[in-house]
A protein has these predicted regions:
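Conserved HGGG/HGGXW glycine-rich cap/lid loop of the alpha/beta-hydrolase fold
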Residues: 9-64
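Conserved catalytic-core motifs of eukaryotic protein kinase domains, centered on the activation segment
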Residues: 38-40, 65-71, 132-134, 217-218
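Flexible "cap/lid" loop of the alpha/beta hydrolase fold
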Residues: 107-112, 117-148
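Catalytic histidine-centered segment of alpha/beta-hydrolase-like enzymes
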Residues: 234-247
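Gly/Ala-rich beta-loop-alpha elbow adjacent to hydrolase catalytic centers
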Residues: 98, 102, 106
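Active-site loop/oxyanion-hole signature of alpha/beta-hydrolase fold enzymes
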Residues: 44, 55-97, 248
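Conserved serine/cysteine hydrolase catalytic core
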Residues: 176-230, 239
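Conserved alpha/beta-hydrolase catalytic His-Asp/Glu region
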Residues: 131-137, 144-199
């Protein structure tokens, strides 16, 4: 695993897997309470993506990355870290894939990387203010209460409900990071991530799990030039439920 120093933090490092390959590197950004080091090895090793250089990023506060206390953990803050990765590695061109919260982060990063961005792919991203069911549930708590006990309770509840993989990622995520990211998703952005996605002048694709259909957020996107692709036999957690199907959807989006 490799790391970069994040500017403006107290020597905090963001860690990532750099899987060797050819062509334009694909930067992979995970969702809330997740980690790319956990969710995406099976996707990255699928035959349709092998041979492509891929950077599997663990955002600050998640996975193997550091957990600075004096960091905002907003979508914009995380996007700045993704940009820092691209700049520090001196990558002349990149593709971005982000899932859920990572989709919103990828959209924000895309706005800052337009000179280097080749293609943008998002999987069931947060596009409008208000967050999702999970982020709203977390953000409804006071920060101190969530950090003290709420995070542990949510993690244990998920484990008991059969969400073992996600619960494991949550267990190693910083409670403060998860809470602040959730409140950022609820707050949204202005312009909205949806408007930013529709306005970008690069090839864009949005991936939806079949079990998430009907999916209202796709309305109007094809007319704006955003391709919509479906992953069969999967819902929101598509990287876990059908990694091969997600790999194929990403590969097709980058073709």
């Amino acid at each position: 695993m490799k790391s970069i120093l994040i500017p403006g933090t107290d020597d905090s490092r963001m860690r990532y897997h750099d899987l060797p390959g050819d062509g334009t590197p694909l930067v992979v950004i995970h969702g809330l309470g997740c980690a790319s080091s956990c969710d995406y090895p099976a996707v990255a090793s699928d035959p349709v993506l092998t041979g492509r250089r891929m950077l599997l990023v663990d955002l600050l506060g998640s996975g193997f990355s550091d957990r600075p206390q004096q960091f905002g953990y907003t979508v914009a803050d995380h996007a700045a870290c993704v940009v820092a990765l691209v700049e520090q590695l001196d990558l002349p061109a990149v593709d971005l894939f982000g899932h859920s919260m990572g989709g919103a982060i990828a959209i924000e990063a895309a706005m800052r990387l337009q000179g280097r961005l080749r293609r943008l792919v998002v999987g069931e991203p947060n596009l409008v203010p208000g967050g999702g069911v999970f982020s709203r549930r977390l953000a409804a708590n006071p920060e101190a209460a969530y950090v003290a006990a709420g995070h542990r309770a949510v993690t244990e509840s998920s484990r008991k409900d059969g969400g073992d993989v996600w619960a494991a990622s949550m267990a190693v995520s910083a409670p403060l990071a998860v809470y602040r990211a959730a409140t950022s998703l609820v707050a949204g952005s202005d312009p909205s991530w949806r408007d930013l996605l529709m306005g970008l002048d690069v090839p864009r694709s949005l991936i939806v799990g079949e079990r998430s259909l009907p999916y209202a957020d796709t309305e109007g996107l094809p007319e704006a030039g955003v391709s919509v692709r479906i992953v069969a036999a999967a819902g929101h957690s598509m990287a876990v439920e059908n990694p091969s199907g997600l790999a194929k959807a990403i590969s097709d989006s980058l073709a």
